[in-house]
A protein has these predicted regions:
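Substrate-binding cleft/loops of secretory-pathway carbohydrate-active enzymes
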Residues: 316-326, 394, 402-403, 415-445, ...
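Hydrophobic faces of well-ordered beta-strands that scaffold small-molecule active sites
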Residues: 202-204, 239-241, 306-308, 381, ...
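Short, acidic/polar
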Residues: 220-230, 358-373, 484-489
Length: 664
């Protein structure tokens, strides 16, 4: 609760504001044009009427936008607003005792009871209008209010009743309220308003050195266009590269994470730095910085964006090691420690010490690295393992970058404990990796997605679903064959507005290190030989999914996800609809990659404004087939090999054309 000034006269109480992340410590997230619904409990002793408004503005601007809030039940008030600029904003609720509304209610009660001796009440109304005229700064409004004041002064009870309900008078009084005793919720709550791509985009990740799929030699930046064209043809919006910086020579890893490398082994891109430079340089085997700039330009001319991995690792050959040895961890004998995550050892990587005595210089240098790449056309950063660096650093550096470049997007690659993942999202990361890769059963998916989309997480945690990564090959994909890849693709593409695939997913690559959830012959350690059009690929299926995503607004949101009932534990059924019901999508997916599954799906007719028993049409957007359904209960059959999923567009009956039903 907060008031402008604490006095006995100021008795309006505002509490339980929603959304409000950790008492206002962290901002809510929205995108430009996306609605923010705000509610609060607003109360006052006695029976006086209240006026309540939702206010919002860009941080740093003096003037507020505002809209009236409506009372819903008891003392709960609600309103919604939209933001038109990619910038940080703030919002609050202001409320006050509205003497004119109270007068209107009191007058109506007395007049309705047959009391015609209302001179005192009319005089009171006249005085209220006169005081509002004194507050008005628009000449026309001032004159109109004075005229109403005069009319009330001279009115009889019957004419007074008409004036008390006069919409023009009510509007004028609302425009010039007495705010001398208003209460305002403080501290103001913040909103980060991002551009639309922060919510909706399809990502395609590939290692540029493997762009041509050659086994024994690497590709260069200028060899990447066919791979980018292929991703564009499949409907992807973002091209994402792992690190492109010079790779260390000392302790370079070999194939399959061997501790010894052979001549010609390219090394791990996450071991950044050698004699050719560090985080502000490119690996010479990929080309030059000019080549990189050219490639980013080519990506943008195709209507796509470029995302770059921001990895805070240094090889033993990184220039920082000689220039700033104090930035690293040291053993008792003075030598620099390499990274370890027992039982794993990373001899080719030196982690940075964010608590070193010169930490401010380190932080500034890492900020400069980000700014360097922003100035070279990078608009999105996928941040490697942010959970192993201080939260305070991320909160500071993201704010510093977005202060001048609010369009920059940060994706947190943090597969860690739930609360730490939430913390990273709260303190500024635009998007977050998730546990999606390990959620494969109906119960697991339903529980996890309900948490993401229907709890307070929806206000600050934006998921980005990757079925696989260069580090993760889930068991479901190792064993389920091509159908498993189709199943996971449709789930990722329709459950989350932001999703992506790592190259090779479209080829259904699924050979693991025995007993592990990692790829055998991973291209983290070697050049990857591939036929990009190998038989059995699912490129056409992914192309359809991305086309469906772009054409259906309901799939651009995640808070609208609702799980529905289907009589089979191996089939999952969920819906997404726009608020105006102009776009309604029903998705049914067979979660069993081996067997045909059947069941009755129950369509929530009332949610889509369809009368029970009324006909409606569903079109399978994957095949073009149309089905006329009637009633809640409808039969489905899904073959994982040929039809693992339905993505239905539901159309309601709008009329008849002769004997033909018309759906829209």
């Amino acid at each position: 609760v907060s008031t402008k000034e604490s006095t006995l006269e100021r008795t309006v109480v505002i509490e339980n504001m929603e959304p409000c992340i950790d008492g206002g410590r962290f901002p809510v997230k929205r995108i430009v044009g996306q609605e923010l619904k705000v509610s609060a409990d607003v109360s006052k002793n006695g029976h006086d009427q209240l006026s309540v408004v939702l206010k919002w503005r860009k941080i740093g601007k003096p003037d507020w936008h505002q809209t009236p809030m409506a009372q819903t039940e008891n003392d709960r008030w609600e309103a919604a607003c939209h933001f038109i600029e990619n910038a940080q904003h703030e919002y609050t609720v202001e409320a006050w005792e509205d003497a004119f509304k109270s007068w209107q209610v009191e007058y109506a009660k007395k007049y309705g009871a047959g009391n015609l001796d209302l001179r005192t009440e009319l005089d009171k109304g006249s005085i209220l209008a006169e005081k509002a005229a004194a507050r008005a700064t628009l000449k026309q409004d001032k004159e109109r209010l004075l005229n109403f004041s005069k009319q009330l002064k001279n009115a009889d009870a019957h004419f007074g009743a008409q004036l008390a309900k006069n919409p023009e008078l009510s509007s004028l009084m609302a425009a010039w309220p007495d705010l001398s005793l208003s209460t305002e919720f403080q501290p103001y709550l913040r909103v980060i308003v991002d551009r639309p791509q922060a919510l909706f985009a399809a990502w395609y990740e590939f290692f540029p050195r493997s762009a041509e799929g050659k086994a024994n030699s690497g590709s260069k930046f200028r060899d990447c266009i066919p791979r980018i064209e292929d991703a564009k043809a499949m409907g992807f919006d973002v091209i994402y590269f792992p690190p492109i910086h010079p790779i260390g020579f000392t302790a370079r890893k070999g194939k399959n994470n061997s501790v010894t490398s052979e001549p010609g082994d390219p090394g791990v891109p996450y071991a950044v730095g050698n004699k050719f430079g560090g985080h502000k340089a490119v690996e010479p085997e990929l080309g030059t910085l000019d080549d990189f700039d050219w490639l980013v330009g080519e990506i943008k001319t195709r209507g796509m964006e470029f995302a770059l991995d921001f990895v805070i690792n240094c090889s033993p050959d990184h220039p920082y090691v000689k220039e700033h040895p104090e930035w690293f961890f040291h053993r008792p004998d003075g030598t620099i420690k390499y990274a370890e995550n027992p039982p794993k050892k990373y001899e080719d990587v030196y982690p940075l010490n964010f608590q070193n005595p010169d930490w401010r210089i380190l932080w500034e240098e890492l900020k400069d690295v980000l700014l360097f790449w922003v100035q070279h056309g990078v608009s999105i950063f996928r941040v490697d393992n942010p959970h192993t660096k201080p939260n305070e650093f991320w909160e500071w550096v993201i704010l510093e970058i977005q202060k001048d470049y609010p369009d920059v997007i940060f994706l947190a690659e943090a597969f860690t404990r739930p609360e730490l993942m939430k913390s990273l999202a709260k303190l500024g990361f635009t998007q977050s990796y998730t546990y999606f890769a390990w959620r494969s059963t109906k119960g697991e998916i339903t529980e996890y997605l309900t948490e993401l989309t229907q709890t307070a997480m929806k206000y600050y945690f934006r998921p980005n679903f990757f079925p696989t990564t260069p580090d993760i090959l889930p068991t479901f994909l190792q064993t389920g064959g091509r159908p498993a890849f189709m199943i996971r693709a449709v789930l990722a593409a329709t459950l989350s507005p932001a999703y992506g695939i790592y190259s090779g997913f479209e080829l259904c690559e699924n050979v693991p290190v025995p007993g592990e959830q990692e790829y055998l012959n991973s291209e983290k350690y070697q050049f990857k030989e591939r036929d990009w059009d190998a038989p059995g690929n699912i490129k056409d299926y992914i192309t359809k999914l991305n086309r469906i995503r772009h054409q259906n607004r309901a799939l651009h949101e995640y808070e609208n996800l609702r799980f529905q009932t289907v009589e089979n534990e191996q089939i999952i059924f969920y819906s997404k609809a726009t608020e105006d019901l102009d776009n309604i999508i029903l998705v049914l997916v067979n979660l069993d990659p081996y067997n045909i599954q059947t069941g009755f799906a129950y369509v929530p007719l009332e949610s889509f404004a369809i009368n029970d028993g009324a006909p409606f049409q569903v079109e399978d957007l994957l095949t073009g087939e149309k089905f006329d359904w009637r009633g809640r209960r409808n039969f489905v059959m899904l073959d994982p090999h040929s039809r693992p999923a339905h993505i239905f567009r539901l159309r309601r009956l709008i009329g008849m054309d002769g004997e033909q039903m018309v759906f829209a």
